[in-house]
C-alpha cells in the first residue's frame, strides 16, 4: 500500500506502521441508481491503534489543514487521539475540516455517535454532512434540523456544507446561506 501511494506521488511521511496490526478494508458497491453501500473489515486495524504519541512526529508548521471524519471517533481510544490531533491543529492555527461521514456499522455504541461528533465541532472551521446525517444527529438531540445546524455554527464553525443526494447542496454561514446545484453525472466508481 505504501509503495503504491509513493508511485502516485502521495506523501507517506505520516504513514505509521503499527506492529501486529492489519489494514482496514472497505468494499464499496454501487446499485443500479449509483447509490453506494459499504462492507467494512476493521478488526485490530492500525487506524484504531493510532495514539497521541504518533502525533508528536507531525511537523505542524509544514501543514495547512487537518481533515478527518467520524470513522476516527468510533471507539474511546481513537476518539481521544482524534481530539488530541484537533487540539494540536487548532493550537498551531491550522484549518480543520470535518466530513461527518457516518458509517453506523463501525460504531461500538450508537449512543456515542452524536456526543463524539458534537465534541469535535468546537475545533472545526468547516463541517460537511449529508441530509441523512443531519436528520439522525438532530433526532439524537431532539432538535429540529435547522436548530441543530445553528448549534454547529454556534460552536465557532465558519462553514457548514449540507449535501442532499441529487438535490442542491447548501452552505451555511452566520451571515448567509447559499444553495448550489451539482451537475448530473453517471457514477462509475467512488
Give residue ranges: language-model regions.
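Conserved N-terminal subdomain of the carbohydrate kinase-like
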Residues: 1-68
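Conserved phosphate-binding/catalytic region of the ribokinase-like
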Residues: 87, 142-190
Amino acid at each position: 500500500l505504501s509503495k503504491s501511494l509513493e508511485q502516485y506521488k502521495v506523501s507517506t511521511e505520516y504513514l505509521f506502521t503499527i506492529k501486529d496490526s492489519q489494514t482496514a478494508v472497505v468494499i464499496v458497491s454501487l446499485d443500479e441508481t449509483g447509490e453506494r453501500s459499504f462492507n467494512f473489515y476493521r478488526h485490530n486495524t492500525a487506524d484504531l491503534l493510532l495514539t497521541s504519541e504518533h502525533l508528536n512526529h507531525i511537523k505542524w508548521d509544514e501543514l495547512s489543514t487537518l481533515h478527518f471524519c467520524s470513522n476516527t471517533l468510533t471507539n474511546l481510544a481513537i476518539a481521544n487521539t482524534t481530539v488530541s490531533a484537533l487540539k494540536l491543529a487548532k493550537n498551531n492555527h491550522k484549518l480543520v475540516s470535518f466530513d461527518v461521514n457516518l458509517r453506523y456499522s463501525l460504531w461500538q455504541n450508537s449512543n456515542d455517535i452524536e456526543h463524539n461528533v458534537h465534541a469535535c465541532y468546537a475545533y472545526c472551521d468547516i463541517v460537511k454532512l449529508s441530509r441523512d446525517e443531519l436528520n439522525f444527529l438532530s433526532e439524537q438531540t431532539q432538535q429540529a434540523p435547522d436548530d441543530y445546524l445553528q448549534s454547529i455554527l454556534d460552536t465557532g464553525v465558519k462553514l457548514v456544507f449540507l449535501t442532499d443526494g441529487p438535490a442542491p447542496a447548501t452552505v451555511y454561514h452566520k451571515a448567509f446561506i447559499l444553495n448550489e446545484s451539482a451537475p448530473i453525472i453517471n457514477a462509475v466508481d467512488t
